[in-house]
């Protein structure tokens, strides 16, 4: 419920928002959360008429783990097979992604200098954990037909390395995908000052207004 406050800037701009819950790592291992988010997107499309959603302007957004899920939801194609358990046969198309300091390369967090305990727990002791990590890593889905992507990341983030954002946006540039990376100087894993938040949301809405269909 605390995350509902993150929706307020969008509501103030006249957006309709859906707050998505997903299975956490202490309930279900990867790729359950990714599957849940893909199914939630399909639910939005299926219920668009009832709630007045504009399916031509669907934006997915999240912070931290939610940032990773926003990226995977907007980037993973149906042929990857991670939406097979979802109800319905809708083919949702995301119009833009807003990624707040999300993971972009899961394998990077499983081994070596960037190893993070939360990533190790999320993958668990599954025998195919490396393959699953590849399947849920946004950097592996970069291609030219992706929606516009904007990321916000602090360059002193101790939880998700800032290099994850740099790596993703370099790949997006090479694929000629519309994208923007907002760097928060000395920013850690969220908790940015009010003046930075005003700057960030101004940039987000400018990016969306410029790149979404009218």
Place the predicted regions along the sequence by residue.
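C-terminal catalytic histidine-bearing segment of alpha/beta-hydrolase fold enzymes
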Residues: 152, 162-214
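Short amphipathic alpha-helix adjacent to the substrate-entry channel of hydrolases
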Residues: 1-18
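Short beta-strand/loop motif that positions the catalytic acidic residue
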Residues: 145, 150-153, 157
């Amino acid at each position: 419920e605390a995350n509902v406050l993150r929706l307020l800037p969008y509501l103030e701009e006249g957006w309709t928002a859906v707050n998505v819950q997903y299975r956490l790592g202490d309930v279900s291992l990867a790729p359950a959360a990714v599957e849940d988010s893909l199914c939630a997107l399909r639910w939005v499309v299926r219920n668009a008429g009832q709630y007045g959603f504009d399916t031509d302007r669907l934006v997915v957004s999240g912070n931290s783990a939610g940032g990773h899920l926003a990226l995977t939801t907007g980037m993973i194609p149906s042929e990857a097979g991670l939406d097979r358990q979802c109800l319905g046969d809708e083919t949702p198309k995301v119009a833009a992604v807003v990624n707040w300091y999300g993971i972009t390369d899961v394998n990077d967090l499983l081994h070596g200098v960037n190893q993070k305990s939360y990533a190790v727990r999320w993958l668990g002791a599954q025998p195919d954990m490396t393959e699953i990590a590849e399947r849920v890593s946004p950097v592996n889905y970069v291609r030219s037909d992706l929606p516009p992507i904007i990321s916000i990341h602090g360059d002193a983030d101790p939880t998700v390395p800032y290099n994850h954002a740099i790596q993703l946006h370099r790949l997006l540039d090479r694929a000629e995908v519309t994208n923007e990376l907002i760097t928060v100087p000395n920013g850690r894993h969220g908790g940015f000052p009010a003046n930075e938040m005003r700057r960030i949301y101004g940039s987000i809405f400018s990016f969306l207004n410029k790149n979404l269909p009218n």
